[in-house]
Swiss-Prot record:
GO cellular component, one term: plasma membrane
Keywords assigned: Aspartyl protease, Cell inner membrane, Cell membrane, Hydrolase, Membrane, Protease, Transmembrane, Transmembrane helix
GO biological process, one term: proteolysis
Membrane topology note: Multi-pass membrane protein
Organism encoding this protein: Pseudomonas fluorescens (strain Pf0-1)
Stated name of the protein: Lipoprotein signal peptidase
Pathway(s) annotated for this protein in UniProt: Protein modification; lipoprotein biosynthesis (signal peptide cleavage)
Major subcellular site: membrane
């Protein structure tokens, strides 16, 4: 295997997952201590605010109104996905840096929200994007942002790979 990285593959990128996890947890700790529930601090009028919200469901509060079983379902899913991401990361070759970064971002975000879900029973969200008082995107957090960026990078890699037979970036 000419492009192999060795026994541990691209696991050296776990530092990025750890960084995402630390920033995510530190930011949640900060905003939970600074804000009351649903309080808004306007950063950019009519566009961007800090707020505090708890999400017992998944993305966009999916299943948030359920009786509590969803906490463990989503925790199990996050654990399974995290395990798959670590194995995938380990198996990457030397020329798959773009993919390694994408996987590390998703993993760090998944672990950040997993910690909240298990330790607190809900995920702490604090970023609110809106247009005046007419449209509000659901509140989210740093972990969600890392997952989204990583997922977009994975999609770009997949589309490029399908089209040309090679990865988007080295």
């Amino acid at each position: 295997m000419p492009n192999a990285v060795g026994r541990f593959g691209r696991l050296s990128w776990l530092w990025l997952s750890l960084l995402v996890l630390v920033i995510d947890q530190a930011s949640k700790f900060y905003f939970e201590g600074k804000l009351e529930m649903f309080q808004q601090i306007v950063v950019i009028p009519d566009l961007f605010s800090w707020t505090l919200a708890y999400n017992t469901g998944a993305a966009f509060s999916f299943l948030a109104d359920s009786s509590g079983w969803q906490r463990w379902l989503f925790a199990l899913i996050a654990i399974a996905v995290s395990a798959v991401l670590v194995v995938w990361l380990k198996r990457l070759g030397r020329n798959e840096t773009w993919l390694a970064i994408a996987l590390a971002l998703v993993l760090g975000g998944a672990l950040g929200n997993l910690y909240d879900r298990i330790a607190l029973g809900h995920v702490i969200d604090f970023i609110l994007v809106h247009w005046q008082n007419r449209w509000y995107f659901p509140a989210f957090n740093f972990a969600d942002s890392a997952i989204t960026v990583g997922a977009v990078m994975l999609a770009l890699d997949m589309f490029k790979s399908k089209k040309t037979g090679e990865a988007v970036h080295d």
